[in-house]
Amino acid sequence: GNGHVKTFWSVGQHCICCAREAAARGLSNRMVLASLLHDASECYMSDVPTPFKNELPEYQEQEAYLLHLIYEKFLGSDLTAQEQAQLEEIDHAMLWYDLDGLLEKQDGEPPKLHIELDYTVESFAKVEAEYIRIFEKYSRSEK
């Protein structure tokens, strides 16, 4: 949304919802953690809107490399093709709802979700605490 949305919604909140959705789908602890971390590169490189990012191939390369390092550090390896497909399915479903709820009604049939979404504005401290709680829970079980 980058300022165009009805209310603030952080990348952290989006990632928390992705992790919760992965858990609700019964995916592995590794996939829950990957879902939480999938936008972690944006902490360092910023959240660039997709239409603009698509025009920045060098940016995409650097972002992919940074995400590779993050996955190596916290998951032990990059995602497999199957894991990447699962993550993209969750991320795209969540983005559909993010756009529908925060920007404008989306066309077509909504993707199936296994969690209830709540776009309540939360304090940074509360979001950070929940992100860390999920990270610690699933990174402990990943070792």
Q: Which residues does each predicted region cover?
A:
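Metal-dependent phosphohydrolase cores
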Residues: 1-143
